[in-house]
């Protein structure tokens, strides 16, 4: 197939050559500046129309020395997946510098709506774009809307607040992710009946709430012999998740499945069985003597150093994966497109859901 040349490949020099005028004259016509004879204006505009020429926004901004600043509001605390996103942002430094962009990360307690709203409010008038891992709460929603009203471009990252006036969401379809986790747990449990545990960070995080919703949909309709227990909220903290799950396992010896919706994975694994993490010599406070990791189907999220080890050791059965590098790059590209008034390439920025097991670890 023959390659199609796009009109944007043309430069001002090409238009000037075709119209028989100088570069300065073309620039004056493009920006409606005075001092150009009417017949010259007509000639330049005719050349532009014939070639469907569009000025290159990025080149024009670079020529004017236009710099932009973006802020990423991220969860504080040891969340391995969020740390991966931050690391990928750091790897983009050369790409960012070439476009006169700077990105800073702002760590905050995203489980505390007041703290998160305050972090967003502090950015008003201070940056061109904000990407935020958001809690779906009225105070956070109002803070997002205030940023938008102030002219800041806002993208929700990983966890959405669709009722706000944010400009775009970058992340997976979390209901579909939860349904996928439900299908995996149900099918891997097999013919057994029993109970299923869910550990989440917070149901106030929309990504966690949507995953739970999707998971419960599948459990209720496709696996009626499995009973889903009330959700434990571990705030993505290892110690809290371990304590909550440990108590639940002792109270319900017939648990056959576990869905870990967010982080806190090390605590969840410790509650299941210490010997799965023998290389770290962690203390099992819940069930080391029962070998529970061999009985409970364990599905979680994201491929990190820890989940990779758990998958290889057979403690974790599957991870629902989203590409943190893609999310970091997509969030920056979307913010830049919004700031420039350019179209968002939605298919390019769509974040896929992948199922990762021991046999297809990347």
Which residues fall in each region the model found?
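N-terminal helix-turn-helix DNA-binding module of bacterial transcription factors
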Residues: 1-66
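Amphipathic helical "hinge" segments at domain boundaries
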Residues: 55-118
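Hinge/beta->alpha junction and helix N-cap segments in small-molecule ligand-binding domains
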Residues: 75-83, 104-115, 136, 170-179, ...
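Hydrophobic alpha-helical
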Residues: 129-130, 134-148, 215, 230-306
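Flexible loop/hinge segments that line or gate small-molecule binding clefts
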Residues: 138-176, 304-312
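A conserved helix-loop-strand patch within extracytoplasmic ligand-binding domains
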Residues: 177-197
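Hinge/cleft segment of the Venus flytrap/periplasmic-binding protein
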Residues: 219, 323-362
């Amino acid at each position: 197939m023959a390659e199609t040349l796009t009109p944007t490949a043309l430069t001002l020099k090409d238009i000037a050559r075709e119209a028989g005028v100088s570069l300065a004259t073309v620039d004056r016509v493009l920006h409606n500046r005075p001092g150009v004879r009417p017949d010259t204006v007509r000639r330049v505009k005719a050349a532009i129309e014939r070639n469907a020429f569009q000025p290159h926004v990025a080149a024009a901004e670079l020529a004017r020395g236009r710099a932009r600043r973006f802020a990423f509001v991220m969860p504080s605390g040891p969340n391995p997946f969020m740390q991966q996103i931050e690391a990928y942002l750091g790897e983009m430094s050369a790409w960012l510098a070439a476009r006169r962009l700077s990105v800073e990360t702002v760590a905050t307690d995203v489980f505390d709506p007041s703290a998160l709203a305050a972090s967003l409010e502090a950015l008003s008038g201070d940056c061109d774009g904000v990407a935020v891992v958001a809690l779906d709460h009225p105070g956070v929603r109002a803070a997002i809307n205030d940023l938008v009203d102030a002219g800041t471009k806002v993208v929700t990252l990983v966890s959405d607040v669709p009722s706000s006036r944010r400009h775009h969401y970058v992340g997976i379809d979390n209901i579909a992710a939860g349904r996928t986790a439900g299908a995996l747990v149900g099918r891997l449990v097999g013919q057994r009946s029993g109970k299923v545990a869910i550990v989440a960070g917070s149901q106030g995080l929309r990504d966690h709430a949507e995953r739970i919703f999707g998971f419960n949909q599948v459990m209720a309709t496709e696996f009626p012999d499995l009973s889903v227990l009330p959700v434990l909220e571990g705030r993505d903290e290892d110690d809290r998740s371990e304590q909550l799950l440990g108590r639940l396992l002792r109270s319900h010896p017939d648990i056959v499945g576990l869905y870990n919706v967010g982080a806190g994975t090390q605590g969840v694994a410790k509650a299941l069985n210490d010997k799965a993490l023998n290389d770290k010599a962690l203390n099992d406070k819940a069930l080391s003597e029962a070998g529970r990791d061999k009985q409970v189907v364990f599905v979680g999220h994201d491929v990190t150093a820890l989940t990779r080890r758990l998958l290889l050791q057979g403690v974790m059965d599957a991870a629902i994966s989203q590409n943190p590098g893609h999310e970091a790059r997509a969030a920056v590209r979307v913010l830049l497109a919004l700031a420039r008034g350019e179209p968002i390439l939605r298919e390019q920025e769509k974040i896929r859901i992948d199922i990762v097991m021991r046999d297809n670890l990347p």
